[in-house]
C-alpha cells in the first residue's frame, strides 16, 4: 500500500488545515500507540518534542491524548531540536519518539515525524502500517490501563552534554567569535549554551521565538541576517540552523555561505585522510552538485546518491555500513555521533577543523568548484498533478535532449510542500537558464 499521509519527512502541512488538524493528530497518536504497543505484556513510553511554532501546543496535546488513550506513557520534552528527540528516544528506552515540527517551513505549517526505539526515522513500511491502523477502528485501552503524561525538565541539558562530547576533548573555542542563528526555533537555548560552554565568544541571532517568527528572515534558509551580524561584529564564523536544528549552513568571516555539499566535501576529505571515512564513501542525494561528485572522484573517493530526504541517506548509510552522508540543504549525518541529521553537531565539527588546522572559515568552506546549478520551485494547487500533463512531459524530454552529455535535469515533487522542483546543472549557463525557464513555464501552464 502506498503511503497517503506520510511524505519524505513525516506528515506535514498548514496547521488547522487537512491533514494537519488536531483531530488527525489525536488519531495518529492513537494509531502509532497501537502500532508500538503490540506487546501488551510490557510498559510502553513515547517521548514527544516540538519546535517553537504556536500550533505545537495544540498538536502536543492531541498526540498526548492519542497515545495515552492506547495505554502508552508520554514524556514531554518541550521545545527541543529534532536530533535531541532521536537521542532521548534511545537513552530513555522509549518505544517511539515524536517531533512536532515543519523544519524549515514557515510558522503556519507544522508536521509530525516519528523515530523508532533505535533513534532512527521509521521506514516506509512502518509508516504504511500506521496508516493502515489509522484507517480502521482504533481500539482504546481499558480505563485502568490509560497512559500517564509527564514533563521532562532536563532534556535540553542531556542534549547539551551529548553535543559537547562530539567535540574533541582536547580542544576549546577560546578566542573564536561565533555568530549562531537559531531561526527562532528549537535550538534557541541549546546552541548558544553549547558554544559558550566550549569557550566561544557567542553572538546569538534568532533566539527570541514568539510562536510566529520561526524561520522568518533568519536561519539556514535565510542566512542574510546572520551574514550581516558576522560582518558587523567582526566574527570569525557563522552557524545557521533551521527551525528544528537538523540542518546547518556555515558563513565565513566575510559572510559568504557554505552549503551542505561543501561541508560534506570538507568532512569526507579530512576523514579519509585520517582513515575514518568508512569504505571511502560519502552518501548524498540526487540534489547534490555534480562538482561534488567530480571532486570526490579526483580524490579516489566514492559518492552514493539516494532519493531526496535525510531518512533515505541514513537508510543507505546503514545498509552500506558507511558513516558520513547528507544533503545539499544542510542535513549532515554522522552515524558515529548520532542517528539523524544534526545541524549543531555538524557546526561543531566545522569549528573543530578551524581550531585544529589553524585556518579561517573562508579557507575551509570551499573545497570544490560547483557546476552551475539552477533550482526553481513551482507551487501547485490541491488535487493538481502538473507532471502528468503531456505538455510538461514534452518540455522535460526536450530539455533532457538539450542537456544530454552536457549536464543533468531533475524534476520532482517536494515531499513536504505542494511544489514541483525543477533543478538543472550545466557548464553552459545560457543553456541552463533557457532549459530551466522552458520547463518551469510548462509546469506553470499546467497548474
From Swiss-Prot:
EC nos: 5.4.2.10
Cofactor entry: Mg(2+)
Domain of life the protein comes from: Bacteria
Annotated PROSITE patterns: PGM_PMM
UniProt GO MF annotations: magnesium ion binding; phosphoglucosamine mutase activity; phosphomannomutase activity
Cofactor note text: Binds 1 Mg(2+) ion per subunit.
Chemical reaction(s) catalysed: alpha-D-glucosamine 1-phosphate = D-glucosamine 6-phosphate
Modified residues (Phosphoserine): 103
Binding site for Mg(2+): 103, 242, 244, 246
Post-translational modification: Activated by phosphorylation.
SUPFAM superfamilies, sorted: Phosphoglucomutase, C-terminal domain, Phosphoglucomutase, first 3 domains
Pfam families named among the record's database cross-references: PGM_PMM_I, PGM_PMM_II, PGM_PMM_III, PGM_PMM_IV
Entries under InterPro entries matching the protein: A-D-PHexomutase_a/b/a-I (IPR005844), A-D-PHexomutase_a/b/a-I/II/III (IPR016055), A-D-PHexomutase_a/b/a-II (IPR005845), A-D-PHexomutase_a/b/a-III (IPR005846), A-D-PHexomutase_C (IPR005843), A-D-PHexomutase_C_sf (IPR036900), A-D-PHexomutase_CS (IPR016066), Alpha-D-phosphohexomutase_SF (IPR005841)
GO cellular component term, pick one: cytosol
Alphabetically ordered keywords of this record: Isomerase, Magnesium, Metal-binding, Phosphoprotein
Catalytic center residues: 103 (phosphoserine intermediate)
Biological process annotations from GO: carbohydrate metabolic process; peptidoglycan biosynthetic process; UDP-N-acetylglucosamine biosynthetic process
Annotated family: Belongs to the phosphohexose mutase family.
Role noted for this protein: Catalyzes the conversion of glucosamine-6-phosphate to glucosamine-1-phosphate.
Protein name (Swiss-Prot/TrEMBL): Phosphoglucosamine mutase
Record organism: Dinoroseobacter shibae (strain DSM 16493 / NCIMB 14021 / DFL 12)
Amino acid at each position: 500500500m502506498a503511503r497517503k499521509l506520510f511524505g519524505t519527512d513525516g506528515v506535514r502541512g498548514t496547521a488547522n488545515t487537512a491533514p494537519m488538524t488536531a483531530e488527525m493528530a489525536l488519531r495518529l497518536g492513537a494509531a502509532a500507540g497501537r502500532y508500538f504497543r503490540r506487546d501488551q505484556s510490557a510498559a510502553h513510553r513515547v517521548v514527544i518534542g516540538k519546535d517553537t511554532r504556536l500550533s505545537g501546543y495544540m498538536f502536543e496535546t492531541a498526540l498526548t491524548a492519542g497515545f495515552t488513550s492506547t495505554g502508552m506513557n508520554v514524556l514531554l520534552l518541550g521545545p527541543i531540536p529534532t536530533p535531541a528527540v532521536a537521542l532521548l528516544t534511545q537513552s530513555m528506552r522509549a518505544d517511539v519518539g515524536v517531533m512536532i515540527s515543519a523544519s524549515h517551513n514557515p510558522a503556519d505549517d507544522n508536521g509530525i515525524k516519528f523515530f523508532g526505539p533505535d533513534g532512527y526515522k521509521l521506514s516506509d513500511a512502518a509508516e504504511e502500517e500506521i496508516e493502515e491502523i489509522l484507517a480502521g477502528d482504533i481500539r482504546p485501552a481499558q480505563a485502568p490501563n490509560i497512559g500517564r503524561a509527564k514533563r521532562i525538565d532536563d532534556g535540553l541539558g542531556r542534549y547539551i552534554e551529548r553535543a559537547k562530547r562530539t567535540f574533541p576533548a582536547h580542544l576549546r573555542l577560546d578566542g573564536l567569535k561565533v555568530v549562531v542563528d537559531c531561526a527562532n526555533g528549537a535550538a534557541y537555548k541549546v546552541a548558544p549554551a553549547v558554544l559558550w560552554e566550549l569557550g566561544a565568544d557567542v553572538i546569538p541571532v534568532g533566539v527570541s521565538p514568539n510562536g510566529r517568527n520561526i524561520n522568518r528572515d533568519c536561519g539556514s534558509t535565510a542566512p542574510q541576517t546572520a551574514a550581516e551580524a558576522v560582518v558587523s561584529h567582526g566574527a570569525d564564523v557563522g552557524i545557521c540552523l533551521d527551525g528544528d536544528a537538523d540542518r546547518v549552513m556555515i558563513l565565513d568571516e566575510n559572510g559568504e555561505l557554505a552549503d551542505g555539499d561543501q561541508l560534506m566535501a570538507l568532512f569526507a576529505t579530512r576523514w579519509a585522510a585520517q582513515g575514518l571515512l568508512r569504505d571511502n564513501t560519502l552518501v548524498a542525494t540526487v540534489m547534490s552538485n555534480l562538482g561534488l561528485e567530480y571532486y570526490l572522484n579526483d580524490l579516489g573517493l566514492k559518492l552514493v546518491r539516494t532519493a531526496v530526504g535525510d531518512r533515505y541517506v541514513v537508510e543507505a548509510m546503514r545498509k552500506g555500513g558507511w558513516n558520513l552522508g547528507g544533503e545539499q540543504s544542510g542535513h549532515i549525518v554522522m552515524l558515529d555521533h548520532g542517528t539523524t541529521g544534526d545541524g549543531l553537531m555538524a557546526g561543531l565539527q566545522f569549528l573543530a577543523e578551524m581550531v585544529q588546522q589553524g585556518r579561517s572559515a573562508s579557507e575551509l568552506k570551499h573545497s570544490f568548484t560547483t557546476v552551475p546549478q539552477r533550482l526553481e520551485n513551482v507551487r501547485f494547487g490541491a488535487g493538481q498533478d502538473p507532471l502528468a500533463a503531456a505538455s510538461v512531459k514534452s518540455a522535460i524530454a526536450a530539455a533532457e535532449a538539450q542537456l544530454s552529455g552536457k549536464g543533468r535535469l531533475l524534476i520532482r515533487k517536494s515531499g513536504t510542500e505542494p511544489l514541483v522542483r525543477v533543478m538543472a546543472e550545466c557548464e553552459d549557463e545560457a543553456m541552463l537558464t533557457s532549459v530551466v525557464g522552458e520547463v518551469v513555464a510548462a509546469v506553470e501552464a499546467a497548474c
